[in-house]
UniProtKB/Swiss-Prot annotation:
InterPro entries documented for this protein: aa-tRNA-synth_II (IPR006195), aa-tRNA-synth_II/BPL/LPL (IPR045864), O-Pseryl-tRNA(Cys)_ligase (IPR005246), Phenylalanyl-tRNA_Synthase (IPR002319), SepRS_C (IPR041590)
Designated name of the protein: O-phosphoserine--tRNA(Cys) ligase
The organism of origin for this protein: Methanospirillum hungatei JF-1 (strain ATCC 27890 / DSM 864 / NBRC 100397 / JF-1)
Gene Ontology BP, a term: tRNA aminoacylation
Entry keyword annotation includes DNA damage: no
Amino acid sequence: MIFDTEEFKKRGKEDFESAWHAGPSVLTPPTTDLMYPRLTYLRAQAHPVFETIHRLREAYLAIGFQEAENPIIVDEQEVYRQFGPEAMAVLDRVFYLGGLPRPNVGIGKEQIQKINSILGRDLSEDEEESLRKTLHAYKKSEIDGDELAYELSGVLHTDDARIVEILDRVFPEFRALKPESSRQTLRSHMTSGWFQTLGAIWEKVPHPIRLFSIDRCFRREQAEDSHRLMSYHSASCVVAGEYVTIEDGKAVARALLSAFGYTDFEFRPDDKRSKYYMPDTQTEVYAAHPDHGWVEVATFGIYSPVALAEYGVGIPVMNLGLGVERMAMIMNKAKDVRELCFPQFFPIRYTDTELAAGVSLLAEPATTPGKNLVRSLINTAVTHSTAIGPCSFVAFEGEIAGKQIRVYVEEPEENAKLLGPACMNEIFVHKGAILGVPDTEKFAEVRKNGISTGISYLFAAASQAAAEIEQAAHFGIPTTVQIKMARLPGDINLKIEPWVMRYITDNNLKTDVRGPVFLTIRSEVLPTSEV
């Protein structure tokens, strides 16, 4: 809360020790949602693949490579130019782009009659002619598919819903359409774009040329598995110049991967021999990391002059590439690339701390006096916890909601303690389970290794009582709050977020907050004469 600085300055000069001890009085008691572990300051989590892309971009830029964007749609002819006789085997793994053909729609008497029936009127001669012209323009691709309904609604002077009905019932040709493949493919590897890019610029820019690109590639795998996806990201670069050799690949690999903590490197001949590389230049890069050990992280090679000649490129070119998803798997110690990339489709895993943040209270006071009442109730209850009933203790006397209120913690039953055995239980999350446990040897493991929610049964019950007393005070009436046997979270004013309950259910975990609370709190409104 905002406090009076002049008052504290004065009090500090008069009695420093007293003023210092009064410091906590300026703090507004927090609601449960503003208490740790519910109160958090979290950095939003980046997706591991895009976090890796970001780091790779920064690493490439730091070692002097300029960023480029290569064509993502590649004509199959480019694959023949790059791979030569090997092209057919490569094309077996690419995705061809296809589309729906434009139907040749005929309009005869039968079609006109059906349209008239749907519209509830006869088409005029001008409307018939305009309809034919519009469908013909669509056939010639002068009108886009997503604009056809709009154009027809203008021609036939009706709304889009009627047009959709006409297309469905009168022109079955649209429903019978089947996709037809083109000769265009989706890029299966970044190399298919580098040849085109280098062919366009190699004679127009200074050498050596150093470019990188990080983007999607698409490969028609037989099936996706824990290490392969049909759509993945490639982090690729080229160095082109008169004096480029295989040594450039080694130097670039070291410079790039050192940014990720790799220290030692080995370069091994790759058994795979892509025809767009020179013989004996395709090389696998293995690197050592303090956490990951030796792992294969990249491949490089020198482009074949046969392939370069197809694009008129007359200088040696070194190409290095690595799979972003593979790098992300290594960095995150992931076992399944599908789960790494698409965690939303896999079971969610929460830590005990994250689950504890989803446990709070159903009801609590809204005002500062009401929040202070909670403290008073707890202090009074703890102080007299072993008192035997019938007994009653004043916990609070003061103003709430403009009314003078007196509040008691009491036990009306004979030979019963003021607090039930479970009142001092505290809510912990341990191995995914939500448990209400006492401070005993039996539950030492839970209290030591679990995560406390910061909520005890007494705190939860006192908060509920304070909220109800606060509400009753607004109406100027007394109230009594009794918490008896707890069987469910709601019995002790406990709120568990739906996502937490779903996690507990999905993983066959448990919520156990059972226990005898037996706490009675009563308020009364004081007459003006007693104030």
